[in-house]
């Protein structure tokens, strides 16, 4: 919940979602949690905070979160407005990506699968307002640049840890969601 600075868990019971306050994750005021994803094995959770512009890494066990790392999504020297938006893991779980509106970039991180911690590899600048993106076949990132009215294609070479902006783009009014059928 962005305004309440918490992640709320729900239980599904006979067609009804019920909030489970015993498992609410409270984060620092002003963080603005946006999206959370889990490692493939379920041991780690990655929370992107849109206001604090950071990623919080948690060890996860039986509904409990233990913070093990917090890392910025944009360079510390960046002085403009930025708001972290989407977060994705590759199917291998070896790399994590975050989009940053304002800084207009995709940040690429290496994931240590033993500790769950991440380390920044580099950032690729995109069009304006990369609100959402998705990974296609672990070879491409399709980025919806809302403020430039385009979908951009980035090429991803996982074995060599390379992410490059390609020449391919498609005009599309204010893309806000990149959904992929699996």
What is each residue range found by the language model?
Residues 1-2, 39, 47-50, 98-101, ...:
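Conserved beta-strand positions in repeat-built beta-propeller and related beta-rich domains
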Residues 107-155:
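C-terminal hydrophobic structural anchor segments
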Residues 48-96:
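Oxyanion-binding "anion nests"
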Residues 10-17, 58-66, 109-116, 154-162:
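Short loop/turn segments immediately following beta-strands, especially the blade-tip
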Residues 18-25, 66-73, 118-125, 163-171:
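Beta-propeller fold detector
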Residues 5-7, 53-55, 104-106, 149-151:
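Structural signal for beta-propeller blades
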Residues 146-155, 164-182:
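Blade-level signature of beta-propeller repeat domains, shared across WD40, Kelch, NHL, RCC1
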Residues 27-42, 74-93, 124-140, 169-182:
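Beta-rich, blade/repeat-based domains predominating
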């Amino acid at each position: 919940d962005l305004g309440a600075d918490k992640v709320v868990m729900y239980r599904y019971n006979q067609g009804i979602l019920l909030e489970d306050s015993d498992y609410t994750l409270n984060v620092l005021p002003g963080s603005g949690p946006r999206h959370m994803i889990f490692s493939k094995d379920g041991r780690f959770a990655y929370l992107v905070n849109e206001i604090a512009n950071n990623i919080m890494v948690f060890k996860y066990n039986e509904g409990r979160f233990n913070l093990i790392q917090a890392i910025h999504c944009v360079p510390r020297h960046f002085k403009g407005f930025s708001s972290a938006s989407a977060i994705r893991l590759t199917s291998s779980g070896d790399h994590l990506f975050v989009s940053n509106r304002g800084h207009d970039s995709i940040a690429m991180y290496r994931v240590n699968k033993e500790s769950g911690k991440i380390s920044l590899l580099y950032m690729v600048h995109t069009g304006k307002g990369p609100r959402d993106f998705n990974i296609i076949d672990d070879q491409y990132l399709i980025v919806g640049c809302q403020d430039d009215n385009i979908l951009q294609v980035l090429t991803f070479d996982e074995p060599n840890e390379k992410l490059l902006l390609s020449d391919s783009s498609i005009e599309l009014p204010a893309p806000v969601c990149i959904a992929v059928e699996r």
